[in-house]
Amino acid sequence: MERVLIVNADDFGLSKGQNYGIVEAYRNGVVTSTTALVNGEAIDHAAQLSRELPALGVGMHFVLTLGKPVSEMPGLTRDGLLGKWIWQMAEEDTLPLDEIAHELACQYQRFIDVFGREPTHLDSHHHVHMFPQIFPIVAHFAAQRGIALRIDRQTVLNADDLPSDLRSTQGFSSEFYGEEITEACFLRILDASAHRGEASLEVMCHPAFVDNIIRQSAYCYPRLTELEVLTSASLKAAIAERGYRPGSFLDI
C-alpha cells in the first residue's frame, strides 16, 4: 500500500532564521509542507521565499498565544498581546469564543492577502485548535472552505462529531521534538503508523537556523538538530525504502 507522508514544518514567518531553516529542509531534506504565522515578524519574508518554491505546500498556523492578533481581542489579550494564559482561560471555560472565531477569519484573510492564495491546510501554534472549546470552530471553518486540518485523533473527544467533509491525514505525530530528535525516532514514528495501517501521516517539525528571535524561544537550539536530521541523506533513503510518498495536504 502506498502511503503519503507529509513532513510539516511549523512556524514559517516567525523569523528569517526559521524561514531559511524550513526552506533548507525542503530543498535538501524531507520537509514537504509548512504552516505560517500571519502575525510573525518575518511573514512577508516567508511569502517572498514561498513564491520561489511553488511546490512547497503552505498552510496557516493559527496563532492565539504569541504576538499581536490581527483583530481586536480585548477578551483574550493583555496589553494588546496574546499569551499562554489561554490555557488557564480554557480550564476556567472563559475563552471569548466569538472573538476567536472572528480572529480565525481575519488571520485567514491576512494569509490570502500576504501569500496571494488560500492555505493548503490549517493547524495552530501550541495546538490551541485542539482545545475542546476551540476545535469545533476551526473544524467547521476548514470544512466550509474545503481545506484540510491537522487533527490529533488521540485528543479529539469524539471522532463522530467531526464534519463529514473535513479532510485530514489518518495519522499525526508531534513526537519528533525536544529530546527525541533523532533519525531513529523519526523512523519509529513511520513504522508505528504503518503498523496501524494508516494511509497518510503528518509528522510535525520545527527546523531553523538560530537568530535573535529564535534565541528568545524556549525551544531554540533543538531546531538546529531537527534541521540536521531532516536533511540527512540516510533519512530520505530510509523513508523511500518504507514505501512512503512525499506529499502535502493537497494530496489528502
Swiss-Prot record:
Keyword Ion transport: no
GO-annotated molecular function: chitin disaccharide deacetylase activity; deacetylase activity; metal ion binding
Entry keywords, A to Z: Carbohydrate metabolism, Chitin degradation, Cytoplasm, Hydrolase, Magnesium, Metal-binding, Polysaccharide degradation
E.C. designation(s): 3.5.1.105
Residues reported in the UniProt entry to bind Mg(2+): 61, 125
InterPro entries hit by this protein: COD_ChbG_bac, Glyco_hydro/deAcase_b/a-brl, YdjC-like
One GO biological process term: chitin catabolic process
Reactions accelerated catalytically: N,N'-diacetylchitobiose + H2O = N-acetyl-beta-D-glucosaminyl-(1->4)-D-glucosamine + acetate; diacetylchitobiose-6'-phosphate + H2O = N'-monoacetylchitobiose-6'-phosphate + acetate
Top-tier EC class: hydrolase
Cofactor names: Mg(2+)
Principal location listed in the UniProt entry: cytoplasm
Pfam family, one: YdjC
GO cellular component, one term: cytoplasm
Pathway named in the protein's UniProt entry: Glycan degradation; chitin degradation
Protein location: Cytoplasm
CDD domains named among the record's database cross-references: YdjC_EF3048_like
NCBIfam families with a match to the protein in the record: PRK02134.1
Family: Belongs to the YdjC deacetylase family. ChbG subfamily.
Functional description taken from the UniProt entry: Involved in the degradation of chitin. ChbG is essential for growth on the acetylated chitooligosaccharides chitobiose and chitotriose but is dispensable for growth on cellobiose and chitosan dimer, the deacetylated form of chitobiose. Deacetylation of chitobiose-6-P and chitotriose-6-P is necessary for both the activation of the chb promoter by the regulatory protein ChbR and the hydrolysis of phosphorylated beta-glucosides by the phospho-beta-glucosidase ChbF.
Summary of subunit composition and partner proteins: Homodimer.
PANTHER family recorded: CARBOHYDRATE DEACETYLASE, YDJC DEACETYLASE FAMILY MEMBER
HAMAP family per UniProt: COD
Record protein name field: Chitooligosaccharide deacetylase
